[in-house]
Amino acid sequence: MAYEEQLDKIINEDGFIAALDQSGGSTPKALLQYDVDHSFYKNDTEMYDQIHSMRERIILSPSFNSKNIIGAILFEMTMNREMNGKKTAKYLWEDLGIIPFLKIDSGLESEANGVHLLKDIKDIDKKLENAVSNGIFGTKMRSVINSASIEGINDVVNQQFKLSHQINKHNLIPIIEPEVTISISDKENAEVILIQSILKNLEKMPKSNKVILKLSLPEIPNFYQPLMKHESVLRVVALSGGYDQTNAIKKLECNNGMIASFSRALTEGLSINQNDEEFNLIINKSINNIAKASKT
């Protein structure tokens, strides 16, 4: 069964999870990094066509394969489109051996208590059923922590874990992402509160439920080791969070057992103006460097 094979791969294989799920407000930034400015599109439909073309170019590049990449996180619109004549998630798994995940959140609430909670996810069960029918293995939801607020961080973690129970019921594996903003002055304190809150929620989880944790690279190396040892945690992955690729890799190398799930740091240096040879050379180098750092 594909699910059992994917589960084994997520737990045991070397490599990283590519984050290709830019959406909404983050799409223009991602396109600008790729040298696609507003002159390339007149409306949202054309903007999403441009981001899909970029993602397709990445996924179809020769180095985007299961040698270094365990999984890929997709935006819903990408999941609903095709690559090489197949729905994207099926193409990733059946042709490349890469596990597909789906970003399911609907964005963030306004900041309160130093954090951004998730907006209500409308028709979540329908969304999860659709994910399963498209061959998706797991989901991802991103919250943001801007302050070492005990109340705020507990709210973020509690909300994420509550949703994770619902996701597990659909036989999907949730990636829980409570991102700590890298520029805040009390980041280390926020991480202390965060790990305590996550451990409390893990202890309350049914033993059959499993999660993946996607966390900002910590101030103290190997700080998240206790989470990696928990029986309910399949993997702890790192977001790049605004660090450039060089710094993200350096920080990742200091955290044994943590693997990358980079977005901006993965696509760094890519441009619509590059020919295929130039493009493939850069993405190949990035994939190899990120995969190497994920093996420490």
Regions from the PLM with identified roles:
Residues 1-137, 145-148, 190, 197-215, ...:
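Alpha/beta catalytic barrel-like cores
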Residues 139-174, 179-214:
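Eukaryote-skewed repeat-based solenoidal scaffolds used as protein-protein interaction platforms
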